[in-house]
Amino acid sequence: MKKIFPIIAFAFLLLSFFCPIIHFLILFPEANPNCVRVGIFYYVWYNGTWENYIVDKPILGYYNSCEPNIINQHFKWFTELKLDFVLISWWGIDNKTDKVTKEVFRIVDENGNFSIKLAILVEPFNETDNGYNFTQIYSYIYENFVEPYPYLYYKLNGKPLVCFFNDEYLTDHYNGEIPKDDRFTVKIVGTRKYVNWVHPCYNSFFWENEIPRERVYTIAPRYDDTRIPNRTGYVIDPDYSQGYYQKEWKKALNYAENSSLDIILINSWNEFAERTQIEPCRDATSIFSDSYHIFNLTKNYISELKNGVKEPSNGYDDPLIFIVIALLILTVIFKIIYDLAKR
């Protein structure tokens, strides 16, 4: 019987080694370097009274973004799509979107679905020459969204991600070199030449011929701001007849196949004014009658990305491989223990 004790001790040693690694990789899938992540822009500014120039109607109706049933349904769809993270459009402290963002974090945390991470996209909420208090912004985000939800907040390069949307008052003044905070990975998103990540819209200077910037490729199903007052009237594939979205996804999949990118960003889940939404809706101009057409296209492309792209691996980056190896080793060890115990 004394022979068994060293084996049992060795088994527990192996368990103590593998379990924290498996636990870490499951809770923090972004730690796996051999996966292309898929994120989406999520707009939480709707209050139930939508602008009359919005012509596409969500199948959930003209909703209020803060309603728990709406948030829950959106995240059920996000889970179905197998998204990795959501960039929440945030318009400053005590703004309506601030309150909704807190509700989103609370609900997702209560549901315990840590497979989809959340991050903040700071929008240009102060359209004056007074400037922005970046120190206050960083501290507020850290204290209200990062610290309370360490498993839920999306991390890039080992730090919580905060994005800023380019704007005359928010980022142009610094020519893109905005004040940073060492607690965060900071990225500027938008259409200016200095941005880190491109946000596809009417004045993206190289949107249609975009190559991945910082290994991030951003795509949109279409663009149409013709109904928004004082806009350019810029249009790309308003009825989906040109197959623009499919072409963009094929480019993205090709980049992924060639290991040329780390993130695919989708613009957007629900920017209905600019008509870039992939949320199921009754579309005013689509040649497809199915309200889920663009949603299902996205779902299929993400599935192809995650299941079909074979990326280089050293054999130890996938959590599943860790689990299989650990189980095999433990099975052998416990078989030995069982055989010795019978003697």
In which residue ranges do the predicted regions lie?
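Secretory targeting signatures
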Residues: 1-33, 40, 312-343
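Glycan-processing catalytic domains of CAZymes
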Residues: 27-312, 316-317, 333-339
